[in-house]
């Protein structure tokens, strides 16, 4: 009898042990899952906090120097442009996509930034072709004069606005001055962390969103400052463009051909920086050798109808709205006839998009004109 009781106890103990073992395993898994979840949550919170601080300390470029906000605006656009302009201020202050649409039905966008260097233009072009293949790319050739990195401030206004990509990494590597570091572009918080003690109202207002500062890449100015006497450029020891500039122009030419895009070279009608005849001859020769179109608008200012007493806001460096609209009408006809760009007016979705854009365009024009009138009456 006692033996049977002992056997029953042993049997029950054997039954209990596997069940207890299973319960322990389940309990351990739950604990482990909670630990993993807590670790993941901690990492997410830390990364989110760092991202938030980074977004807070990065310059917003909403007032004053707004050029740093231009590059990023492109990503919110529908990617179905006929023409993409790529280059420096000689494009984004001198060409009005609104006029090209209203008068020629050409849908265009300017991927411009201050002192955009030719290698930056190339990598912006490379990146753009991942989003869309326009019929024409227009490149302003003023940046052919540069063959070395220039300034971190200008680099930042182009590169910080680019989305992360291999094109951005290569653009950074090509652009950095000796004092700059790649890691500070990849993680801008490392560069801007000191701004945490210098934050302004804009840093909080535009933390999660930014207002548009351009109209399809065009920066509008309606004020007027007449051009005075423009001196000729100082003599140079060597007028030849550097081989690095030609290397990137060759890359642009090849990239456009590979993608079935027509590359058009232009020189905007800015009175200075001075554009030497020797520089112009090199561009004419390059265009001839590569079967490209090249237009130097400095040679046709009278045909365009430009008056540098009324059509510039800074003495001839850039055109104001009046001058930009004149140049856009002139160039729009060239794009339509010589680049065979048909009018897209009548496309419902595009018409609706431009209706909203034109409303904002004329609203800003009116606002600036009213402000200018008030300033003149002071």
Question: Across the structure, where does each feature detected by a protein language model lie?
Answer:
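N-terminal Lys/Arg-rich, disordered targeting/topogenic segments
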Residues: 1-34
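Hydrophobic membrane-insertion alpha-helices, especially the h-region
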Residues: 37-55
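Alpha-helical transmembrane signal-anchor/signal-peptide segments
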Residues: 56-79
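Membrane-embedded segments
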Residues: 86, 90-172
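Acidic/histidine-rich helix-loop elements
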Residues: 108-114, 237, 241, 316
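Conserved, well-ordered alpha-helix/loop/beta-strand core segments that scaffold catalytic motifs
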Residues: 136-148, 207-304
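C-terminal regions of proteins
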Residues: 277-352, 356, 360-378
């Amino acid at each position: 009898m006692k033996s049977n009781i002992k056997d029953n106890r042993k049997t029950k103990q054997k039954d209990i042990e596997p069940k207890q073992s299973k319960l322990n395993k389940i309990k351990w898994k739950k604990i482990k899952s909670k630990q993993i979840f807590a670790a993941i949550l901690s990492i997410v919170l830390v990364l989110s906090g760092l991202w938030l601080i980074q977004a807070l300390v990065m310059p917003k470029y909403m007032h004053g120097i707004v050029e740093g906000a231009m590059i990023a605006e492109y990503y919110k656009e529908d990617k179905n442009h006929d023409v993409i302009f790529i280059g420096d201020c000689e494009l984004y202050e001198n060409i009005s996509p609104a006029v090209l649409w209203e008068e020629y039905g050409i849908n265009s966008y300017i991927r411009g930034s201050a002192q955009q260097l030719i290698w930056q233009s190339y990598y912006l072009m490379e990146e753009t072709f991942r989003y869309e293949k326009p019929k024409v790319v227009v490149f302003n050739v003023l940046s052919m004069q540069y063959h070395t990195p220039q300034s971190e401030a200008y680099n930042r206004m182009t590169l910080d606005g680019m989305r992360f990509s291999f094109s951005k990494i290569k653009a950074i590597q090509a652009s950095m001055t000796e004092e700059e570091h790649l890691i500070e572009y990849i993680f801008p918080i490392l560069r801007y962390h000191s701004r945490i003690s210098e934050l302004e109202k804009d840093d909080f207002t535009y933390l999660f969103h930014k207002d548009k500062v351009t109209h399809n890449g065009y920066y509008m100015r309606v004020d007027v400052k007449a051009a005075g006497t423009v001196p000729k450029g100082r003599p140079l020891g060597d007028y030849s463009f550097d081989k690095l500039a030609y290397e990137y122009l060759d890359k642009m030419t090849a990239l456009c051909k590979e993608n079935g895009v027509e590359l058009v070279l232009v020189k905007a009608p800015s009175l200075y920086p001075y554009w030497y005849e020797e520089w112009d001859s090199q561009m004419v020769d390059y265009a001839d050798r590569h079967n490209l179109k090249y237009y130097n608008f400095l040679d046709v200012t009278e045909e365009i109808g430009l008056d540098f007493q009324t059509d510039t806001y800074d003495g001839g460096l850039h055109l104001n709205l009046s001058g930009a609209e004149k140049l856009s009408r002139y160039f729009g006809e060239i794009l339509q006839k010589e680049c065979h760009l048909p009018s897209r007016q009548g496309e419902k979705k595009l018409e609706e998009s431009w209706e909203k854009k034109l409303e904002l365009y004329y609203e800003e024009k009116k606002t600036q004109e009213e402000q200018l009138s008030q300033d003149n009456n002071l």
